[in-house]
């Protein structure tokens, strides 16, 4: 049986365009989160917002499980009316497509690895996986 590949060309092109559109939308969401986080960090300046860290330091941190496994990267900081951080928006490690969840500041501890300042949690990747997706506006 001979298959005419040309018949499928429009379908393959459509699929490729759909994938591209999904990637573009993901990139736009990520860019928007990053821009808002950077603006907020700039406004906070050198003022510690949680755990003795500035907002910029929190944004540079990775979230680690107790065993050192990377759980995700901090993408944004949610603050209360007084400017204190209450939770972190993280991009879950190795998620595809990118998945974002919010975790509370309570229960996190500062961990220094070389020149890196990260945050340790008692949560596991299974715990992170069971959290609801964060609502991103």
Each PLM stretch: what is its role?
Residues 2-14, 22-137:
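Peripheral interaction segments used for macromolecular assembly
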């Amino acid at each position: 049986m001979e298959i005419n590949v040309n018949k499928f060309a429009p379908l393959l092109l459509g699929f490729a365009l759909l994938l591209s559109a999904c990637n573009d939308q993901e990139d736009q969401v990520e860019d928007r989160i990053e821009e808002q986080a950077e603006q907020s960090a700039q406004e906070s300046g050198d003022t510690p917002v949680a755990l003795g860290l500035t907002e910029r330091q929190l944004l540079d941190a990775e979230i680690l499980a107790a065993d050192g496994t990377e759980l995700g990267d901090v993408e944004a900081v949610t603050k209360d009316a007084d400017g204190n951080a209450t939770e972190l928006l993280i991009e879950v490690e190795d998620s595809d497509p990118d998945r974002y969840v919010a975790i509370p500041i309570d229960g996190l501890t500062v961990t220094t690895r070389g020149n890196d300042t990260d945050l340790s949690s008692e949560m596991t990747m299974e715990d992170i996986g069971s959290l609801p997706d964060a609502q991103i506006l």
